[in-house]
Amino acid sequence: MELRRSMALPRLLLLGLWAAALRDGAVAAGMKFTGSPIKLKVSQGQPVKLNCSLEGMEDPEMLWIKDGAVVQSVDQVYIPVDEDHWIGFLSLKSVERTDSGKYWCQVENGGKKEESQQVWLIVEGVPYFTVEPEDVSVSPNAPFHMACAAVGPPEPVTIVWWMGDSRVGLPDISPSILNVSGINQSTMFSCEAHNVKGLSSSRTATVQIKAMPLPPLNVTVSQVTSSNASVVWVPGFDGRAPLHSCTLQVAESPDGQEVSTEVAPVPPFAYGVQGLKHSTNYSVRVQCSNEMGSSPFTERVYFQTLELAPSSTPQNIHVIQRDPGLVLEWEGVAPDVLKENVLGYRLEWIQDNVTQGEMIVQDTKANLTTWNPLKDLIIRVCVLNSAGCGPWSDLFLLEAQEVMGGQRQPPYGTSWVPVALGILTALVTAVALALILLRKRRKETRFGHAFGSVVGRGDPAVHFRAARSFNREGPELIEATLESVGISDELKTKLKDVLIQEQQFTLGRMLGKGEFGSVREALLKLDDGSFQKVAVKMLKADIFTSTDIEEFLREAACMKEFDHPHVTKLIGVSLRSRPKGRLPIPMVILPFMKHGDLHAFLLMSRIGENPFNLPLQTLLKFMIDIASGMEYLSSKNFIHRDLAARNCMLDENMNVSVADFGLSKKIYSGDYYRQGCASKLPVKWLALESLADNLYTTHSDVWAFGVTMWEIVTRGQTPYAGIENAEIYNYLISGNRLKQPPECLEDVYDLMCRCWHPEPKLRPSFGVLRSQLEMIRGRMSTLSLSQDPLYVNIGKDKESSVSDPAVHTSFGNTDGDETIAGAAAAAITSDYRYIMSPLCLGDDVEGERHPEGQEGENKSLLYELETEGEKSC
């Protein structure tokens, strides 16, 4: 059906994609798409906006599908009309032919994918060429033809031909063939394609005239033997016609008498000449041919064949004992028997089945000095000339017991010594390999593998462009205020100045979803009218009470106090209204971090679909950033309690910020906090005192920082892989620690071990850790950071304004952006495990330091260093 242009939006075509029923009719109870299918024709280059409406589902994750594939457009917005009514928009700012196809919405509900009916988008424009004139070569005045074809829509398409600057023939419906009777000089041809939208011009093709080839170049002769030679050449200009053969003329020199003429099919441009005489001078020249004729011959190239190798063998070998060596004699080859120009003889002697040496002599006698008279001696001789060595003589054996006199010539026996040595070597090798594999298996069993495999799903980073903001308040909605959510007065006071009205931002696609909530990309409208890309963290609609809201917003209140480049800063909080007197949905607005969490980024670098190198200098920078942020937090008397790579975020400039303060606490008195019951804790990052007595201090954050350093060095491996949560405390109290990764510097691992000291007060402060890491990185500064491979082609944003908020995370060409972003998204799996706190004490703040009993118990945690296997603390 035709789409009329709106008077209010003359250049914006709105398509209502309203699907009345899902394809299979299996609609979940109460959930439905509304509307009907539609067919749209639009001109190329025009903007188009598609929308679909879904009712009966809270917080759906809608996807746009085109021809069966998920649409990766950056211009997608999802707007809640009310609690269970959502509208999704897909904007195409300048449609191309490739945008033509079938579009529909898809949502997953209860494990089933439900789809709306389809919309057909047809993009019309000037004709598009499918066949264009090609460059060809033709014989003079010979007939030939040219082809041209183009398609719409719209149809029909008419073809007009041009020869040089003149039109040829009459317009013809595509596809068109132009028949040319012949030309005698190079000529250019092109075609035009016309339809009601306009015309397109094809490429200009050049038709050349064929000619005879030019002579070959660089003729060389190689691999010369006594009877053969290899000739290689480079073809000259082929006359714009393929060469089909080359002719070689071989002649004896100096009289130039032709010996043979050889025709070689080409390519390859090489030929082996056979049947030549030995020790003879020859010359060769080459010409090549195409359908138009043959080139002139090249200049002659001269070469000489080699001599024949000797064919006779020395006879009657005998040896005479002399002190200190042996004199060997044999019958020489008569000069009138051979014409191979004998140069001498080669003698070879063997002991213990190994050639001990050889010598070349001019006459028929040789003096042997370097041999062992206590072992059997085998001798053989051949005739030698410039072509090589002739056949070997019969083997002559001189046994050890006959050294002092006699001599005989028994057959050449076989020794079993090499066989026995070979078998022994194979057995030793097999045993060594078995021991290596066994040792490796034991290590894997004890510590496990960090990961089996991580398969990137190819999901792209989430991008969108918000065309406008929407007021979602209706007559049924109760205004969402801090007074309406049932939180404490203290928390209301803290959040009052950072409360943002929900009309000020527009939600985009979902970035991630967890057990208790989700994170969406959004555009926040600022006071000056500009827009800022942010991330919105919200609780799920069906799992929270006033207590849940208060705990969720306490994290925001905690972040409000932070102002440091390496600590995530709160932008604001907001409340989404809901009907029927239900509690509003709390939302925390945070800066948008382009590269996501650090753990996912590290995994992507190691086992993503397109792994990339993270130099040690870059890894050290990550550690320094985290240490700097934690130094700031500790100076503010904050303990994090959940420091890990997964809770650190990476921005577009590769700077790390400490984030996720859901477990953080401020210490108003004393230096420690005692955890109450019913809190979930990341066991493998906890310090010994935290596991034993639920005590949390800045020193316990230092322990977690050591584990985070280990995560960074291993590029995201799981700490204590293969060890259950319930076993961690006994594992640590026994003196065990994480092992030194293979590529970890000694200085860096020493810092980790200091972070894991059993006595909390003997662990370094974050200021000391930052300083030490900066010193280590400074010693590596010989390699300029500008040469750091990590910074090659990252963030290839062509536009950074709100008009095109596309995000690219590329480590290669632009085609790899979505693949790498998808691999990072696939890597965010929160693969660590939690257990409940072992003690159920009151969740309060104690204004005292460790009692003596606790200090004594902590001191009892001291252990002796283990030295077996890999290096450990």
UniProtKB/Swiss-Prot annotation:
Residues 847-858 have a biased composition (Basic and acidic residues). SMART domains: FN3, IG, IGc2, TyrKc. It catalyses: L-tyrosyl-[protein] + ATP = O-phospho-L-tyrosyl-[protein] + ADP + H(+). It is an enzyme of class 2 (transferase). It is found in: Cell membrane. Disulfide bonds join C52-C105, C148-C191. Residues 29-416 are extracellular. Residues 845-873 are annotated as: Disordered. Residues 505-776 form the Protein kinase domain. Residues 1-28 form the signal peptide. The active site is at D642 (proton acceptor). Autophosphorylated on tyrosine residues. The keyword Kinase applies. It is a single-pass type I membrane protein. The chain crosses the membrane at residues 417-437. Residues 438-873 are cytoplasmic. Keywords: ATP-binding, Cell adhesion, Cell membrane, Disulfide bond, Glycoprotein, Immunoglobulin domain, Kinase, Membrane, Nucleotide-binding, Phosphoprotein, Receptor, Repeat, Signal, Transferase, Transmembrane, Transmembrane helix, Tyrosine-protein kinase. InterPro entries: FN3_dom (IPR003961), FN3_sf (IPR036116), Ig-like_dom (IPR007110), Ig-like_dom_sf (IPR036179), Ig-like_fold (IPR013783), Ig_I-set (IPR013098), Ig_sub (IPR003599), Ig_sub2 (IPR003598). Its EC number is 2.7.10.1. Belongs to the protein kinase superfamily. Tyr protein kinase family. AXL/UFO subfamily. Receptor tyrosine kinase that transduces signals from the extracellular matrix into the cytoplasm by binding to several ligands. Regulates many physiological processes including cell survival, migration and differentiation. Ligand binding at the cell surface induces dimerization and autophosphorylation of TYRO3 on its intracellular domain that provides docking sites for downstream signaling molecules. This is Tyrosine-protein kinase receptor TYRO3. The lineage of its organism: Eukaryota, Metazoa, Chordata, Craniata, Vertebrata. The gene is TYRO3.
